[in-house]
Amino acid sequence: ATHLTKFPNEYDSNIISCCVIERKRESDGCTYTKRVAAVRNVLPSLLRKVETLQVEHFELEEECWWNTKLRKLMVKSHNLSVSNWITMREASVFTPHQHNPNWTHFEQEGTVTVHGLGKLGYLIEVFSKRFLSAGAQHAITITEKLMAERQTRITSVWYSEFLFA
């Protein structure tokens, strides 16, 4: 589950920190993890007209359910900060692809709603949609890089132990 260990990393400077708040094994065998992340405020200054949006970072809460038997990861996240103005929600599911279990089938949906800011709210929604869509693709690329690095480390450790055993 590279997803649960990938942030922060050197590939995405917008993730400032990520702290595990809770981790437990549920009765169905799933591992439940709740994290809070601090993410850089990427809103352009033009869209930061409201005082509560003039912050360095936002906090997001993420909940994950990892079923190792089914190889299924479900992720739900929402914003904790500025929630009186903006509601951001995202849900993702990672499962083995039906035609090749070595591939991952990835589904994601999300919403951004801005409350009570009129045309400024509409501009924030449009910006957020574009930024988050690009961010989802960027997150996939980061995950692939981290998985490749992890595989290289595992292979090199195994190989060096084999040579020097």
What are these regions (language model features)?
Residues Y11-D12, R23-S27, R48-E56, W66-A165:
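Terminal "cap-and-tail" regions of soluble proteins that handle hydrophobic small molecules
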